[in-house]
């Protein structure tokens, strides 16, 4: 069976939205959501309103910058009393902790995973020291203003992040524009657009499989192996993996993060045009046309010598999604004799969605680390 197909969490498309552009978030439930957004909102809708400029306002330039530090909050409790092996006997081929009591063999030497003679000692921080301090840098600059009949806002945000897992990073760049215009006293328009570009490298896989670095790190790392030692000894002079045991049953976590990387990149465009016309008092005609489309590429590679994929392999995904939506709403509102209020609404919705997913996999690589199909 294939033990390498671990799922990688790439988040969801809500994470593309730039928080610096958000004015408000409202949750609609029940009939109100369905009336405004149709069958797609039968279970409710989250409405995100983005920032815009103000009419009759001077031009303002706003700069925001923030830095965040991230560390692993909680790790499992590990025993540091027994060495690897079974039935109280040391065995370098076994990665579990049922070997001899470490304190009882301090005067003896044993063969480690590299074949060296060593004295056994516990390393209480060998999992903790694998992780690094993650850092995030978020910078935003926006320009906003408006005149008597128009307003505008431009914004650019960069997000650059290094993760707690060594070799992992995430970068996102978002540009947005929001502009409105009063063409006449009863005819207005607004246009908004966002472009998002993001890429990441080194996202860890999940699940009980060989591509998940937590399997060798938490389940397979004996307490007597120093994490700093395997960091320096994950690959030999011939480019082959130095596994955690001489029989090659468990990947070295540093082999996974250096050789078996998952990468992805995304380009997304969101645009809306809203026109509102009030021909007579109480009658409002609004048309909102919008599109949302993105392309995303993902790639997961396994170098030759990886446990579970000894001959190497790689897999790619090319995703494309496009949504076109148009809402036409006509409403009429009138109060009679100060006692009776009449309100009517009629609308039409056009919704079109296109989705493509191309998934290709190659195994038994002829040339190591040549991850192309041609």
Q: Language-model features: where?
A:
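Short acidic/polar hinge/loop motifs at secondary-structure boundaries
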Residues: 1-29
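Short beta-strands and strand-coil junctions in structured, solvent-facing domains, enriched
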Residues: 2, 31-36, 53-56, 69-72, ...
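Soluble periplasmic/extracytoplasmic beta-strand elements of cell-envelope proteins
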Residues: 24-28, 45-49, 62-64, 190, ...
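N-terminal periplasmic accessory domains that precede
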Residues: 35, 41-65, 139-141
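Outer-membrane beta-barrel channels and translocator barrels
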Residues: 19, 136, 147-148, 184, ...
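Residue-level signature of outer-membrane beta-barrel architecture
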Residues: 50, 145-147, 158, 181, ...
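Surface-exposed loop/interface segments of Gram-negative outer-membrane beta-barrel transport/assembly proteins
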Residues: 56-122, 163-170, 174-268, 288-374
